């Protein structure tokens, strides 16, 4: 009996030590994430809100259209390939050749997509901006900055992934902090030099992406052995993973900026600046959205099936609580947020709560999407249902809302995000019942 009691005591002690070690590890990761993302978030918020105050309404509208267009193209030239690397590598993160193989496959697809997308994008960019009488030289400079950002963003996306796989959170955030300081400093220099225009701001952003992309590329060398050519089998595996999501990604690329593009087409330059400024308030959710890929995605990918439902509900519940609280505060106390936007936008008191509501719905959807991707709940019917429902609702909104006004564009964004959220909840229920598709299981 004494021997058995002693054995139980040793087992209990070992279990407690293991639990304590895991707790310390996750606490360390969470602390590093909050410190790193907090620093990046604060620096980017400061820069963004300084630009709101420093730039004229016309210059800010021009810069915002270029930024929105670049964000859309970033989705189109990636199609989720970079995000798929974590799921495809799985628990083989210590194998440098495996990580390098999938990075090379992601490059394979990105290079081909860029060569197709850029010529088409040039035509669309000219069409979108044709309503506004802006100089041709300005449009060319803005579009060239978009191309430059796309090229350098590839470095940042590919070579930051090995750091996430190995959960080296500090090394993941260091380059972003450096480039954020770089961007803020250059914007300040341009301001005091009276040279802060739309195109100069756009090129400063491009240079910041180049800085942290180069640092990532150098820092990832010890973690990756990248082949000279992509592996056809890895390409096929990645394509099987991405296939069901490609229609959704293409559609979402346009959806992400549709509010800005609609107000650009239907509204005036001031309306463009207002929608873009209110979009800055959505950055309240940026630190939480980044947590999807840095914390939630790797965590859910490793959760045992028996514990998945509980973890899923816990994460969803926390995200709902955070989003609801921020939304309520924005409606009840809009003045602090208006002060942050600056004196040019103090007339947006009735709009700011709706902007946060739309961002809240989008954030909750991003949490669900991160968990679904981590479990490989990627279905062809999901993309089709998502696209059909949203297009149907948006066509109805075109007839019901006055999209030349800032407030109605915000209503449009909120309704769209709620519809997308409904589809994602359906996907989650189906995933628990049926699991991932056979090709991805």
Question: PLM features: residue spans?
Answer:
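Hydrophobic alpha-helical transmembrane segments
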Residues: 140-144, 173-222, 385-393, 404-431
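Hydrophobic faces of transmembrane alpha-helices in multi-pass small-molecule transporters and flippases
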Residues: 23-46, 107-112, 143-147, 170-177, ...
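Membrane-interface junctions at transmembrane-helix termini in multi-pass inner-membrane proteins
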Residues: 150-174, 301-305, 357-384
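Interfacial segments at transmembrane-helix termini and the short loops linking adjacent helices
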Residues: 127-145, 269, 332-360
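Helix-loop junctions and terminal segments of transmembrane helices
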Residues: 78-94, 164-165, 282-306, 373-374
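Signature of the first transmembrane helix
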Residues: 6, 24-86, 149, 243-270, ...
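Membrane-water interface segments that mark the loop-to-transmembrane alpha-helix transition
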Residues: 24-40, 66, 75-128, 305-327
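N-terminal membrane topogenesis motif
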Residues: 1-43, 97-100, 104, 230-245, ...
């Amino acid at each position: 009996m004494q021997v058995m009691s002693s054995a139980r005591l040793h087992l209990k002690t070992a279990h407690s030590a293991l639990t304590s070690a895991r707790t310390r590890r996750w606490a360390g990761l969470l602390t590093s994430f909050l410190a790193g993302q907090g620093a990046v978030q604060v620096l980017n918020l400061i820069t963004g809100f300084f630009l709101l105050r420093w730039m004229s309404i016309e210059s800010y509208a021009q810069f915002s259209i270029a930024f929105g267009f670049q964000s859309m193209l970033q989705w189109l030239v990636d199609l989720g390939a970079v995000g798929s690397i974590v799921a495809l590598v799985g628990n083989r993160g210590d194998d440098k050749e495996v990580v390098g193989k999938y990075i090379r496959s992601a490059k394979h697809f990105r290079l081909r997509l860029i060569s197709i997308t850029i010529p088409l994008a040039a035509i669309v960019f000219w069409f979108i901006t044709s309503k506004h009488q802006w100089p041709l030289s300005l449009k060319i400079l803005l579009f060239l900055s978009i191309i430059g950002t796309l090229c350098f963003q590839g470095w940042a996306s590919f070579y930051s992934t090995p750091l996430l796989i190995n959960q080296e959170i500090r090394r993941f955030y260091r380059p972003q902090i450096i480039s954020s300081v770089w961007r803020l400093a250059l914007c300040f220099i341009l301001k005091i030099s009276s040279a802060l225009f739309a195109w100069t701001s756009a090129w400063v952003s491009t240079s910041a992406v180049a800085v942290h992309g180069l640092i990532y590329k150098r820092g990832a060398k010890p973690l990756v052995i990248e082949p000279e050519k992509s592996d056809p089998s890895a390409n096929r595996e990645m394509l099987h993973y991405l296939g069901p999501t490609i229609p959704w990604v293409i559609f979402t690329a346009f959806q992400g900026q549709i509010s800005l593009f609609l107000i650009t087409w239907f509204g005036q330059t001031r309306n463009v600046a207002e929608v873009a400024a209110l979009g800055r308030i959505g950055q309240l959710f940026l630190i939480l959205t980044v947590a999807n890929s840095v914390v939630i995605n790797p965590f859910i990918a490793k959760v045992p099936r028996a514990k998945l439902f509980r973890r899923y509900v816990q994460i969803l519940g926390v995200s709902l609580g955070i989003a609801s609280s921020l939304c309520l505060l924005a409606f009840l106390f809009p003045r602090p947020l208006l002060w942050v936007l600056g004196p040019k936008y103090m007339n947006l008191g009735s709009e700011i709560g709706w902007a946060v509501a739309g961002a809240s719905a989008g954030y909750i959807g991003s949490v669900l999407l991160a968990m679904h991707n981590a479990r490989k709940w990627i279905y062809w019917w999901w993309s089709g249902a998502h696209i059909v429902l949203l297009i149907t609702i948006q066509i109805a909104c075109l007839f019901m809302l006055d999209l030349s006004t800032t407030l109605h564009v915000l209503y449009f964004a909120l309704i769209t995000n709620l519809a997308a959220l409904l589809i994602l909840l359906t996907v989650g229920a189906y995933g628990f019942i049926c699991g991932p598709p056979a090709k991805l299981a």
